[in-house]
């Protein structure tokens, strides 16, 4: 037993040390300053919106859905490694202390998003709930903590199943149950909430019984752990080089016509390589598309001010540009690129050419969203602000960043 606990403590210390190392680079970045200003602006807008909530706004449903998303995303960090399939497999019968510690750590470490959302939702709760008090909200928060534990246990039980459809069904059922029970809890309709709680208890008993007849899925847990680490590495790689990051590429043959737009010339060597990496890597094109869609929707359905629409547009483009910074070093592992008869200045020029093209397309789409929300004035503000950022600010800023990290 002590050996398994020692292994867990060693893994946990290693995990925390690695996380702190990368967080040091992430939190020291200028991006934090931008985020602070953005959060300050969002807080100001939120406080004004709370004072004048539209009568038709479904406040209880919105709170229930947002909390359900956080609760349903529960999981257990086992910190298992690929080698454990060989060295710890013979000790499977003695893994219980290790897994209990993993469960406790996962529960505590995942409380931060729940606490943060609870703080953000508190003004909305008091604004729309008749007779609301700190005691009533504290009662809601206690139930959120219990629901978090229930979701984590249920997710853990599904890891013993081989059927992927059952795992998908588990997520759907848990999300629906969380949403319903919280909708009733926020309105203090505990008669219906109790009924949902009973159903959730039955589901817990069923999944616990089903899990007892299954074995521990080593491959599945190790794969899940590696996937979560790679997800963190991808985020950290936006700020510093991460040697453990595994690159993934997708064919995307339907985008080949864009590659044909790059002239077949020696001076366009890196232009072709950067374009190919941008289109086929799982990191770059996806980031551009996701951020464009998310911020465009925020602008269209939240902002009616031309200035706010322009600020959101510039912020989205800045965030996207920063996250595309690792593209410049995408081929650093290829030693042969040093032999290419192409000057380094040409490589930098090719990178900025692609970056400006991609961000200009994003800026145009975001400006259209600004026009939808704030008219022609919003369109012009967003377009002008984006142009200054893309063609003046970002090139200078990113050149400095590349020199700082020894890329130039």
Swiss-Prot record:
Signal peptide: none
Membrane-spanning ranges: 30-50, 53-73, 111-131, 134-154, 180-200, 284-304, 308-328, 351-371, 374-394
GO BP, sorted A to Z: establishment of competence for transformation; sporulation resulting in formation of a cellular spore
Phenotype seen when the gene is deleted: Cells form colonies in which certain architectural features are absent or less prominent than those observed in wild-type colonies. The Ecs activity could be important for the development of communities.
An example Gene Ontology CC term for this record: plasma membrane
Pfam short name (any one): EcsB
Function per UniProt: Presumed to form part of an ABC-transporter, it may form a transport channel.
Name of the protein this chain belongs to: Protein EcsB
Organism of this sequence: Bacillus subtilis (strain 168)
Lineage, broadest ranks: Bacteria, Bacillati, Bacillota, Bacilli, Bacillales
């Amino acid at each position: 037993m002590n050996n398994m606990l020692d292994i867990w403590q060693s893994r946990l210390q290693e995990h925390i040390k690695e996380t702190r190392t990368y967080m040091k680079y992430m939190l020291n970045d200028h991006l934090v300053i931008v985020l602070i200003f953005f959060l300050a602006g969002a807080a100001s807008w939120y406080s004004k919106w709370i004072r004048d909530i539209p009568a038709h706004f479904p406040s209880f449903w919105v709170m229930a859905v947002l909390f359900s998303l956080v609760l349903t995303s529960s999981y257990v960090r086992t910190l298992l490694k690929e080698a454990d399939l060989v060295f710890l497999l013979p000790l499977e019968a003695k893994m219980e202390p290790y897994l209990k510690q993993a469960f406790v750590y996962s529960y505590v470490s995942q409380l931060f998003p729940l606490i943060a959302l609870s703080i953000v939702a508190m003004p909305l709760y008091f604004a729309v709930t008749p007779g609301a008090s700190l005691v009533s909200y504290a009662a809601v928060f206690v139930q959120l903590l219990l629901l978090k534990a229930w979701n984590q246990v249920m997710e853990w039980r599904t890891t013993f199943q081989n059927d992927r459809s059952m795992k998908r069904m588990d997520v759907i059922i848990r999300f629906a149950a969380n949403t319903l029970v919280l909708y009733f809890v926020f309105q203090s309709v505990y008669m219906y909430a109790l009924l949902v709680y009973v159903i959730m208890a039955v589901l817990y008993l069923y999944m616990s019984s089903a899990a007892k007849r299954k074995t521990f899925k080593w491959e599945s847990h190790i794969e899940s752990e590696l996937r979560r680490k790679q997800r963190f590495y991808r985020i950290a790689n936006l700020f510093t080089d991460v040697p453990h990051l595994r690159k993934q590429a997708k064919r995307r043959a339907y985008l080949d016509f864009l590659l044909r737009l790059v002239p077949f010339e020696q001076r366009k060597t890196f232009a072709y390589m950067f374009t190919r990496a941008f289109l086929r890597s799982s990191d770059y094109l996806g980031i551009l598309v996701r951020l464009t869609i998310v911020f465009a929707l925020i602008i269209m359905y939240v902002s009616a001010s031309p200035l706010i629409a322009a600020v959101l547009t510039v912020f989205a483009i800045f965030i996207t540009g920063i996250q595309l910074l690792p593209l410049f070093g995408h081929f650093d592992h290829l030693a042969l690129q040093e032999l290419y008869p192409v000057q380094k200045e040409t490589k930098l020029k090719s990178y900025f050419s692609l970056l400006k093209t991609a961000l200009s397309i994003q800026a145009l789409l975001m400006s259209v969203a600004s026009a939808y929300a704030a008219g022609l004035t919003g369109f012009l503000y967003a377009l002008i602000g984006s142009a200054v950022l893309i063609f003046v600010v970002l090139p200078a800023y990113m050149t400095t960043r590349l020199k700082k990290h020894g890329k130039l």
